[in-house]
């Protein structure tokens, strides 16, 4: 296999893996959105008819609404700390040759 074929093979493999990864991500996103909207649906419950002979019918109401209104008049004034990191000089001193050596 010549070098050009190796480059094409490696890049094609990388592109294939990235496309598969993108498809898995889109499927995950679609499932999350679909399941999120499915939770909000309430089951259809029919009202019991008057002609039923069973007198122990239980009606469950799933449409409950709670309204809360919070009113606060609190103003917090916080002084910001004057912290400045000077990035024009190194953050730590290098005392070894290992970092500067090239292999």
From Swiss-Prot:
Region (Involved in apical transport and lipid raft association) residue spans: 11-33
Region (Head of neuraminidase) residue spans: 91-103
Topology within the bilayer: Single-pass type II membrane protein
Manner of cofactor binding, per the entry note: Binds 1 Ca(2+) ion.
Membrane-spanning parts: 7-35
Segments in the Virion surface topological domain: 36-103
Cofactor: Ca(2+)
Regulation of catalytic or functional activity: Inhibited by the neuraminidase inhibitors zanamivir (Relenza) and oseltamivir (Tamiflu). These drugs interfere with the release of progeny virus from infected cells and are effective against all influenza strains. Resistance to neuraminidase inhibitors is quite rare.
Post-translational modifications reported in the UniProt record: N-glycosylated.
This enzyme's EC code(s): 3.2.1.18
Residues covered by region (Hypervariable stalk region): 36-90
Keywords carried by this UniProt record: Calcium, Glycoprotein, Glycosidase, Host cell membrane, Host membrane, Hydrolase, Membrane, Metal-binding, Signal-anchor, Transmembrane, Transmembrane helix, Virion
Subcellular location: Virion membrane; Host apical cell membrane
Main location class: virion
GO terms for cellular component: host cell plasma membrane; membrane; virion membrane
Glycosylation sites: 51, 54, 67, 70, 86
Other remarks in the entry: The influenza A genome consist of 8 RNA segments. Genetic variation of hemagglutinin and/or neuraminidase genes results in the emergence of new influenza strains. The mechanism of variation can be the result of point mutations or the result of genetic reassortment between segments of two different strains.
Record remark: domains: Intact N-terminus is essential for virion morphogenesis. Possesses two apical sorting signals, one in the ectodomain, which is likely to be a glycan, and the other in the transmembrane domain. The transmembrane domain also plays a role in lipid raft association.
Oligomeric form and interacting partners: Homotetramer.
Family, similarity comment: Belongs to the glycosyl hydrolase 34 family.
Protein name per Swiss-Prot or TrEMBL: Neuraminidase
Originating organism: Influenza A virus (strain A/Duck/Alberta/28/1976 H4N6)
Gene expressing this chain: NA
């Amino acid at each position: 296999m010549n070098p050009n074929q190796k480059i094409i093979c490696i890049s094609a493999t990388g592109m294939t893996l990235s496309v598969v990864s993108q498809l898995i991500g889109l499927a995950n996103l679609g499932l999350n959105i679909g399941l999120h909207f499915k939770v909000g649906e309430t089951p259809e419950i029919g009202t019991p008819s008057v002609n039923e002979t069973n007198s122990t019918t239980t009606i469950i109401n799933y449409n409950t609404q709670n309204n809360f209104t919070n009113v606060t008049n609190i103003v917090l004034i916080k002084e910001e700390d004057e912290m400045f990191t000077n990035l024009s000089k190194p953050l730590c001193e290098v005392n070894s040759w290992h970092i500067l050596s090239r292999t």
